[in-house]
Amino acid sequence: MKITRLTTYHAAPRWLFLKVETDEGITGWGEPVIEGRARSVEAAVHELAGYVVGKDPARINDLWQTLYRAGFYRGGAILMSAIAGIDQALWDIKGKALGVPVYELLGGLVRDRMKTYRWVGGDRPGAIIQQITDYRALGFDTFKFNGTEEMKLIDSARAVDAAVVKVAEIRGAFGNTIDFGIDFHGRVGAPMAKALLRELEPFKPLFVEEPVLAEQAEYYPRLAASTSIPLAAGERMFSRFEFKNVLCAGGIGMVQPDLSHAGGITECVKIAAMAEAYDVGFAPHCPLGPIALAACLHVDFVSHNAVLQEQSIGIHYNEGADLLDYVVNKDDFHCVDGSIAALPKPGLGVEIDEEMLKRANENPPDWRNPVWRHSDGSIAEW
């Protein structure tokens, strides 16, 4: 079998799909994208196509190493996302060719279902409480929400109090009947992160995500020493080499690589194993589409330290299309009591409606993340 062609499709709300074709008629799907930089990743995918067209798709490890090492300059968000999407598609092809789900190729199941959590939006406690109430009725008991809006490097007691009041109201509304993570989203600098963690500790969040930006990873062990709240990070780390440094330094209780940003299945299986060796949980970041979610689930199902899976089915920011709109076999992704069962179909287990994708690609989205500014006019982290 040889790879013959790579085709990309843009689709609302902010996704890029990749179809990899072979001379035997077996196709694989991947999702290589950086939110807000889809065209940059698309260009990288087609630039890398020359390394894979004409090659045997079954040699996934060799192709991955070629894509990563054949360029003198390597790594980074764009290239690793391009590699990720190609890698996902190669695993999809191999599973379909052999008639088994990808998790069987990775050694088989360590669990039968994977616990997922719901992201809930809004900055007012009442809006978040209502969303949690609605999702609890569907069987979910674990959630995540943003901890704060933009925050200055050194900010006021009012800013801290606003974040604390929101969390206090949510915990007060539900008691310990729910768990929640709080996402700082890299909006908080190290000085304020320490203050916020101290004030939030009485409300027992399940974790705090991106307490500081990945560029400030040296603060993770210092912040961890100041709190009992588990810290999570990794959505803006793109290879096992970045995770190596963080794991060796300590401080992180949960790693969150993105299967569409951090080199795909091949790389993230290694990251999960590295984390397990350090007694660190694995909870892939996934605010993206169905192929990214499927890739995450296959790694979750073979990783003993996988603790939670993010997913964006029905989430408020999926404007123009929802996660399962491009999927034929929607029932395979059905959540029961907040968990998704092992995907039964060969490969990644996603049947894509390509005709719908083609129509979506005729009117491609141009999503970009908001640009925030502080009151003095300086740029703020979103």
UniProtKB/Swiss-Prot annotation:
E.C. no: 4.2.1.6
BP GO annotations: amino acid catabolic process; D-galactonate catabolic process
Positions bearing the site annotation: Transition state stabilizer: E310
UniProt GO MF annotations: galactonate dehydratase activity; magnesium ion binding
Highest taxon in the source lineage: Bacteria
The keyword Cell wall biogenesis/degradation is assigned to this record: no
Pathway annotation from the record: Carbohydrate acid metabolism; D-galactonate degradation; D-glyceraldehyde 3-phosphate and pyruvate from D-galactonate: step 1/3
Span list, region Disordered: 361-382
Increases basicity of active site His, annotated site positions: D258
Cofactor binding, note field: Binds 1 Mg(2+) ion per subunit.
InterPro entries associated with the record: DgoD-like, Enolase-like_C_sf, Enolase-like_N, Enolase_C-like, Galactonate_deHydtase, Mandel_Rmase/mucon_lact_enz_CS, Mandelate_racemase_C, Mandelate_racemase_N_dom
Residues at the catalytic site: H185, H285
Binding site for Mg(2+): D183, E209, E235
CDD domains: D-galactonate_dehydratase
Cofactor(s), names only, from the UniProt record: Mg(2+)
Keywords carried by this UniProt record: Lyase, Magnesium, Metal-binding
Catalytic activity field: D-galactonate = 2-dehydro-3-deoxy-D-galactonate + H2O
Functional description taken from the UniProt entry: Catalyzes the dehydration of D-galactonate to 2-keto-3-deoxy-D-galactonate.
Other facts: Reaction proceeds via an anti dehydration.
Recorded family membership: Belongs to the mandelate racemase/muconate lactonizing enzyme family. GalD subfamily.
NCBIfam families per UniProt: PRK14017.1
Official protein name in the record: D-galactonate dehydratase
